Amino acid sequence: MKGKFISFEGIDGCGKTTQIKFLEEYLLKQGYNILVLREPGGTKVGEKVRDILLDKNNFISPVTEMLLYASSRAQLVEEKILPAIEEGKIVLLDRFVDSSYVYQGYARGLGIEKVKVVNEIATMGILPDVTIYIDITPEEAMKRRGKREADRLERESWDFHKKVREGYIKLVKEFPKRFVFIDGMQELMKVHKDIIDVVKKYL
């Protein structure tokens, strides 16, 4: 039996990583075989790319940024995601191609189509069975981050993060069969329950 592929999206600080951890614990208790991955990263090569992308001292042009994300993604798909799905595992991925659509395509202004062409090569055309979008405001994201040191993307302007959120909401509306909108402003365990209710439908 083939596995499942579930991705999580949202602006920085929306709680993806926490909710993935909660979901992993829940699914392991149900007896499922789980692989948790993150983007950029998840492989030896990808983690090196991640260091470049998130280093606050680096100036990276929008096109370079798009290509670096795509290179990390290509390695992840071939080395980890496809083999895990073939082995019947449930892959929980913290960000995938939709992040590039909104961050580089929409917020950076490169255009969705340009990003799509590059990423169809990088992903070999695979898409998640379901994408869980956790929605919070940029104001809430900043509050949650608190005094933790921000990485290169987190240090972007207020307007940039507003555009990222707008981009996600457009994607949710454009691809309603794949995306599920989760209100991330709710209490932590209510968000977790909503996510479990969604995931159960795909298992």
From Swiss-Prot:
InterPro entries referenced in this protein's UniProt entry, alphabetically: P-loop_NTPase, Thymidylate_kin-like_dom, Thymidylate_kin_CS, Thymidylate_kinase
Q: Which residues bind ATP?
A: G10, I11, D12, G13, C14, G15, K16, T17
Which keywords has UniProt assigned to this entry?
A: ATP-binding, Kinase, Nucleotide biosynthesis, Nucleotide-binding, Transferase
Q: Which domain of life is it from?
A: Bacteria
Query: Catalytic activity, per the record?
Result: dTMP + ATP = dTDP + ADP
Q: List the PROSITE patterns hit by this protein, alphabetically.
A: THYMIDYLATE_KINASE (PS01331)
**What GO CC annotations are associated with the protein?**
cytosol
EC number per UniProt: 2.7.4.9
Quote the function comment for this protein. Answer: Phosphorylation of dTMP to form dTDP in both de novo and salvage pathways of dTTP synthesis.
Protein family: Belongs to the thymidylate kinase family.
Instruction: State what protein this is by name.
Output: Thymidylate kinase
The species this protein was found in:
Thermoanaerobacter pseudethanolicus (strain ATCC 33223 / 39E) (Clostridium thermohydrosulfuricum)
Tell me what gene encodes this: tmk
